[in-house]
């Protein structure tokens, strides 16, 4: 049975998954355009991260950063390689959307890439109602970056 828990980032499995996430973000992004948070940034008070577990195995993680009292940003969405195509990302994004609503956010945003490596993420966000729009949160627009938003209220 899968379960989602708020993560304190002290476990070996979450550390390994986040290191993989960072490495692939830098591999699949032009220099200077990988904006994945490292584990120290994910510990900041404006960020909450959750992990999804399948028994004792880490299946994925996702974080929510507060940009303003009414605006959140999705960060560090990652499915563990052994759990791809099992609905992990769908469960995590549904959790983030619900949490954003409980926090009173009116808008949820994210930044992602545009190369083939990001196609599954782009499809996931579109399937949950995110629409492409303007840059936000201090990001610099480029041919690589794409920005998506979901109105919650």
Positions of the model-derived regions?
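Acetyl-CoA-dependent GNAT
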Residues: 2-75, 80, 93-94, 99, ...
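Conserved beta-strand-loop-alpha-helix junction that forms the acyl-donor binding cleft
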Residues: 110-121, 139-143
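Conserved acetyl-CoA-binding loop-helix of GNAT-fold acetyltransferases
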Residues: 79, 85-98, 123-127
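Generic structural signal for conserved hydrophobic packing positions in ordered secondary structure
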Residues: 18, 74, 108-110, 118, ...
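Short coil/turn segments at alpha/beta junctions that flank glycine-rich nucleotide-binding fingerprints
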Residues: 70, 86, 103-106
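Short hydrophobic/aromatic beta-strand or adjacent loop that forms the aromatic wall/cage
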Residues: 47, 143-148
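Conserved GNAT acetyl-CoA-binding A-motif
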Residues: 100-113
């Amino acid at each position: 049975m899968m379960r989602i828990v708020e993560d304190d980032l002290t476990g070996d499995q979450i550390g390994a998954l986040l290191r993989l996430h960072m490495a692939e973000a830098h591999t699949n992004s032009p220099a200077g355009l990988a904006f994945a948070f490292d584990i120290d940034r994910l510990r900041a008070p404006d960020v909450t991260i959750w992990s999804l577990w399948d028994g004792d195995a880490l299946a994925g993680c996702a974080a929510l950063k507060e940009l303003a009292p009414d605006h959140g940003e999705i960060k560090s969405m990652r499915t563990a390689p052994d759990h791809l195509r099992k609905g992990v990302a769908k469960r995590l994004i549904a959790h983030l959307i619900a949490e954003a609503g409980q926090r009173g956010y009116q808008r949820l945003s994210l930044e992602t890439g545009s190369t083939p490596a990001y196609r599954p993420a782009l499809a996931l966000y579109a399937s949950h109602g995110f629409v492409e729009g303007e840059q936000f949160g201090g990001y610099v627009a480029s041919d690589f970056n794409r920005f998506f938003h979901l109105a919650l209220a």
